[in-house]
C-alpha cells in the first residue's frame, strides 16, 4: 500500500498532468478521508 506521502505525490503529479479543473479538494477529501491530512491547505 502506498504511504500517505507517496499517494499525495502521485495525486499532485496526476493533477499537473490533467489540470486542476478536473479535481476538487472537497470531493477528493470526502472520497479519501484517510489522505485528507496530506492535502495542502488550499
From Swiss-Prot:
Name the UniProt key words of this record, in alphabetical order: Disulfide bond, Secreted, Toxin
Assign the protein's first listed, main location to one coarse class: secreted
**Gene Ontology biological process terms in this record:** lipid catabolic process
According to the UniProt record, one GO cellular component term is: extracellular region
Q: In which tissues is it expressed?
A: Expressed by the venom duct.
Cellular compartment(s): Secreted
Q: Name one GO molecular function term.
A: toxin activity
Q: Would the keyword Disulfide bond be found if you checked this record's keyword annotation?
A: yes
Q: How does it assemble?
A: Heterodimer of an alpha and a beta chains; probably disulfide-linked.
Say what the protein does: Heterodimer: conodipine-M catalyzes the calcium-dependent hydrolysis of the 2-acyl groups in 3-sn-phosphoglycerides. This activity may be supported by the alpha chain. Conodipine-M inhibits the binding of isradipine (a ligand specific for L-type calcium channel) to L-type calcium channels.
Name by which UniProt lists this protein: Conodipine-M beta chain
State the organism named in the record. Answer: Conus magus
Amino acid at each position: 500500500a502506498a504511504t500517505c506521502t507517496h499517494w499525495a505525490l502521485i495525486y499532485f503529479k496526476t493533477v499537473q498532468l490533467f489540470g486542476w479543473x478536473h479535481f476538487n479538494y472537497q470531493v477528493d477529501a470526502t472520497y479519501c478521508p484517510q489522505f485528507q491530512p496530506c492535502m495542502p491547505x488550499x
